[in-house]
């Protein structure tokens, strides 16, 4: 048995498309939709299509708990040894989940695995495989040092998109929260997602904790899903606020003892300065009705 947990917040018709694709999987499956007090018709639409399917369960939360909180609300209803955390704007192929299960069975050292996440145009989505964004790597990205010193591993950025895809499953440092295939026993040891991250960076935090617990994280290049993006309507400033807040917490959680305190202070200040400089642009996007992807 595999349990899929989907956190929904005003995802519209995308939620139904995601669940429909999951229900096409051949193996035993349970789907838990954790709804963060949506105000649209996404749940009603889903129930109209699949309300009679016993594999589907709806958990109605009384407020918007964020991604981590929504995922954690679904955990008590998990059955089986594997849990798939997947965004509501993702569409999977019928064999994807079973292939991920088979892979995890053959790699007992792996606590979590991710797959190739594609954009609608078929290109690889940035963030589906990456190095941990340490303060140094983030500085490299901001200053574009990877372009000044191509090929120098000291100046590589954290995103791996654009590099050649491996021919087989490989270990990576971090994957995307849009699709996380997790071993339940590892989850019990590592613990739930950190709810201090409302949106973004909770996946990085979890990857760090899984690796600290001795588990590997696998990237599976021959299993692909499509991430449509736009699964939730939120203002650009709201999303970027939580993204920057999450990065500041992530740096403090894992790197405050590895870097001099003055450097960490500068890094945190740089995070908030970046958001401040972006704010006029983000406000303009909100006025134009442009909504970013929540993941």
Regions found by a protein language model. Give the residues of each.
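Short, acidic, metal-binding catalytic loop of nucleotide-sugar glycosyltransferases
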Residues: 20-29
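Glycine-rich, basic loop-to-helix element that forms the pyrophosphate-binding segment
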Residues: 60-78
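Short, flexible, basic/aromatic active-site loop/helix in glycosyltransferases
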Residues: 132-172
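A short, conserved alpha-helix in the catalytic core of glycosyltransferases
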Residues: 164-224
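Active-site-adjacent helix/loop segment of glycosyltransferases
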Residues: 205-286
């Amino acid at each position: 048995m595999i349990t899929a947990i989907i956190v929904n917040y005003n995802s519209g018709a995308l939620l139904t498309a995601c669940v429909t694709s999951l229900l096409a999987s051949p193996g035993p499956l349970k789907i838990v939709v954790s709804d963060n007090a949506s105000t649209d018709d996404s749940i009603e639409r889903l129930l109209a299509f699949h309300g009679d399917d016993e594999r589907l369960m709806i958990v109605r939360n009384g407020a918007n708990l964020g991604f981590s909180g929504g995922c954690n609300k679904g955990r008590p209803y998990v059955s089986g040894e594997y849990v798939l955390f997947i965004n509501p704007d993702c569409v999977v192929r019928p064999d994807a989940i079973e292939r991920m299960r088979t892979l995890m069975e053959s790699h007992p050292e792996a606590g979590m695995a991710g797959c190739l996440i594609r954009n609608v145009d078929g290109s690889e989505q940035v963030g589906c495989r990456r190095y941990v964004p340490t303060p140094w790597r983030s500085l490299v990205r901001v200053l574009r040092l990877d372009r000044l010193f191509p090929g120098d591993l000291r100046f590589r950025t954290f995103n791996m998109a654009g590099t050649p895809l491996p021919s087989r499953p490989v270990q990576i440092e971090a994957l995307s929260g849009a699709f996380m295939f997790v071993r339940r026993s590892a989850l019990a040891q590592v613990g739930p997602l950190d709810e201090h991250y409302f949106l973004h960076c909770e996946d990085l935090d979890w990857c760090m904790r899984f690796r600290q617990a001795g588990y590997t994280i696998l990237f599976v290049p021959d299993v692909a899903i499509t991430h449509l993006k736009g699964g939730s309507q939120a203002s650009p400033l709201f999303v970027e606020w939580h993204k920057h807040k999450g990065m500041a917490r992530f740096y403090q959680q894992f790197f405050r003892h590895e870097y001099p305190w003055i450097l960490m202070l500068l890094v945190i200040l740089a995070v908030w300065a970046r958001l401040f400089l972006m704010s006029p642009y983000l406000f303009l996007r909100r006025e134009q009705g442009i909504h970013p992807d929540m993941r």
